[in-house]
Amino acid sequence: MIRKTLTILAVSCMMYSCATKTESNPFFTEFQTQYGVPSFDKIKLEHYEPAFLKGIEEQNQNIEAIIESPEIPTFENTIVALDNSAPILDRVSAIFFNMTDAETTDSLTALSIKLAPVLSEHDDNISLNEKLFKRVNDVYQKKDSLNLTSEQERLLDKTYKRFIRSGANLSEK
């Protein structure tokens, strides 16, 4: 609990220190182009960090809503909700990591190094979230009775295995 509180505090402080206007950061809204592709001419180095931090905050809020839901875990309210929990983080990650792979600069590399522990901790906080795993596991255990499409089965399987491979089902020993 203390770790989670400190993480939220650290992310909030980082967001405050690198805040940019919402309307000026292209990652904060869906791309307004004909096919929804990124407007690379509008993306600047200073947009990445605030977008990552806001994306983390957004996903944390969405995950909190999933785990606090009084409804019985279902494919829709747990698996689909989790898959759709990070629109900003998904947008900024897709572009940032493609840019660092294809056209990196010293500034992008430095930012990647700075963000790596923040993103790693965020991923750990999701993968090791006991309440979230319980909901995912509840859906997974009744998968044969859910009449899922092959795409839905694949999403459920990938989601469940991500938690298992990250150690969610390990004992405290």
Protein language model annotation of sequence segments:
Residues 1-23:
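Bacterial Sec-dependent N-terminal signal peptides
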Residues 18-173:
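Zn2+-dependent metallopeptidase catalytic domains
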